[in-house]
Amino acid sequence: MRVALGMLWLLALAWPPQARGFCPSQCSCSLHIMGDGSKARTVVCNDPDMTLPPASIPPDTSRLRLERTAIRRVPGEAFRPLGRLEQLWLPYNALSELNALMLRGLRRLRELRLPGNRLAAFPWAALRDAPKLRLLDLQANRLSAVPAEAARFLENLTFLDLSSNQLMRLPQELIVSWAHLETGIFPPGHHPRRVLGLQDNPWACDCRLYDLVHLLDGWAPNLAFIETELRCASPRSLAGVAFSQLELRKCQGPELHPGVASIRSLLGGTALLRCGATGVPGPEMSWRRANGRPLNGTVHQEVSSDGTSWTLLGLPAVSHLDSGDYICQAKNFLGASETVISLIVTEPPTSTEHSGSPGALWARTGGGGEAAAYNNKLVARHVPQIPKPAVLATGPSVPSTKEELTLEHFQMDALGELSDGRAGPSEARMVRSVKVVGDTYHSVSLVWKAPQAKNTTAFSVLYAVFGQHSMRRVIVQPGKTRVTITGLLPKTKYVACVCVQGLVPRKEQCVIFSTNEVVDAENTQQLINVVVISVAIVIALPLTLLVCCSALQKRCRKCFNKDSTEATVTYVNLERLGYSEDGLEELSRHSVSEADRLLSARSSVDFQAFGVKGGRRINEYFC
């Protein structure tokens, strides 16, 4: 017994002091001899019931593997006593958070592997405590973003695996650092290689991935990717498309297009404010008033074929309260840009010059030599409003973005042709029979005929208050010969002309109307219809009642007479049966009424079809 105890004591004394009682009970420890003769201890803990890292890890451990456990978090400075630790592997645990001090004291750490956990965030600043770290494996976690400041903590890495996370994009600072790798710290003739794992992430393919796509195309020769066939997950139109097939544009801040700074509109009319901007991605457009009042209109958004984003603010029936500055804003993630458009609401001018002759129906002279006239030999032509006197163009006029257009008058010859000879007779007379078919106090519908027009022929409708020089233009889509003009003033006389776009309207292509005449006529017609229907009802109703009463009275009399006949016993004269030529007895041809029927058990009606019985003539009479 004493000998056995002595042997055990000797064995205990001979055991290395580093391993004496240091290996945790839930782990396994092993000692390896390295090539240089040094010893390296490896500790492996894979108990599924382990919830925290063990506290009694040997301080000479160089490799620590805590895998497939129930560890959810790592306390701060949990590994600080392990000053010789070079590899820290924590794969396939339940880690959901890491302490920013978890790497404190690990100056020799070269590998940090955390795949298969539940990390939604990573303490990037903790990498400062591990200056020799070269490998960081964060595969199969729940990272949704990498902050821009993380780029300066990842400069020394040669292997970074961010695959199978929830990354949609990477910060520009990180991509730039990868694209400009320095080679000074590497031996001459050796180029640094950085291995990146970015596959299996839901990438949002927009301009922010422009530089990353170029990296995959071999733009940075010092980079190597675990998987180069990255694919888009959004937007839906690009889902599943490989990066190699993308044609992305560089991001660009919003830039507003210069436009009109001030717009004038008549009181009660419709004002249209337009604003356009370019940017990558396309900017979001919005309107607001400079004085903070709410907008009294509708906003429409559209994107033109060249990628310009347009926003249109329509203000119907403007009043003086709508006057003021309107701010158009274009915004994307790179910034915002604004412009101010002023709206001035003016009173509609009234005509003060009148004359009884047809030649002075409509005349007004504007500033700067602009004028408009309407008579038997003058027609209106519209050109964009300019400060100098307007002159006739030799080619088709270019449509202006302004709504208000001025009129220029010119003389027509006896044949009704245009004096400038710009359009042929067939083109000038293409529009015929301009009529007003519908009218309200604020709108009017015009129709016309254009039998020679083609499907591509576009028409323009010009209208203005009768006596004013300022006209508005409505562009009609090709193929249509009807248009409705809205935003008119009630009880106001207007003139409207229809012509082929780019041509001068002729006198017979214009029509003068008032916004109250047709409405009043329609109201009168409706009143006449109501009166006619009322008179018809008054006349027809008594006649209908009279006919019904007469029919009911006749019915009642018939029923009363029938009852009286059956209840009263009367004597009747009997009709004598006549003889036919064939020897048969027949009833006489006289009609037998209800009063002539005989009251008896055997009615004479039974024998009205009388006949021969037993070969003898039978004459029967009943009383």
Swiss-Prot record:
Q: List the disulfide bonds.
A: C275-C328
In what residue span(s) does the LRRCT domain sit?
A: 201-253
Spans through the membrane: 527-547
A single GO CC term for this protein reads: synapse
The principal localisation class reads endoplasmic reticulum
Keywords attached to this Swiss-Prot or TrEMBL record, sorted alphabetically, are: Cell projection, Disulfide bond, Endoplasmic reticulum, Glycoprotein, Immunoglobulin domain, Leucine-rich repeat, Membrane, Repeat, Sensory transduction, Signal, Transmembrane, Transmembrane helix, Vision
- The LRRNT domain, residue ranges: 22-59
Give start and end of each Fibronectin type-III domain: 430-518
Residues in the Lumenal compartment per record: 22-526
Any matching Pfam family: I-set
Residue ranges of the LRR repeats are 60-81, 84-105, 108-129, 132-153, 156-177, 571-594
- Biological processes per GO annotation: phototransduction; synaptic signaling; visual perception
Q: Where is the Ig-like C2-type domain?
A: 266-335
Q: Does the keyword Endoplasmic reticulum apply?
A: yes
Q: Which residues lie on this side of the membrane: Cytoplasmic?
A: 548-623
- Residues spanning the signal sequence: 1-21
Annotated InterPro entries = Cys-rich_flank_reg_C (IPR000483), FN3_dom (IPR003961), FN3_sf (IPR036116), Ig-like_dom (IPR007110), Ig-like_dom_sf (IPR036179), Ig-like_fold (IPR013783), Ig_I-set (IPR013098), Ig_sub (IPR003599)
Its membrane topology, per UniProt?
Single-pass type I membrane protein
Q: Which residues are glycosylated?
A: N156, N296, N455
Recorded hits in CDD domains, A to Z, give: FN3
Q: How does it assemble?
A: May form a homodimer. Interacts with LRIT2; may form a heterodimer with LRIT2. Interacts (via its N-terminal extracellular domain) with metabotropic glutamate receptor GRM6. Interacts (via its extreme C-terminus) with the scaffold protein FRMPD2 (via the third PDZ domain); the interaction leads to their colocalization in photoreceptor synapses.
The job of this chain, per UniProt, is described as: Photoreceptor synaptic protein essential for normal vision. Involved in synapse formation in cone photoreceptor cells.
Q: What is this protein called?
A: Leucine-rich repeat, immunoglobulin-like domain and transmembrane domain-containing protein 1
Gene transcribed to yield this protein: LRIT1
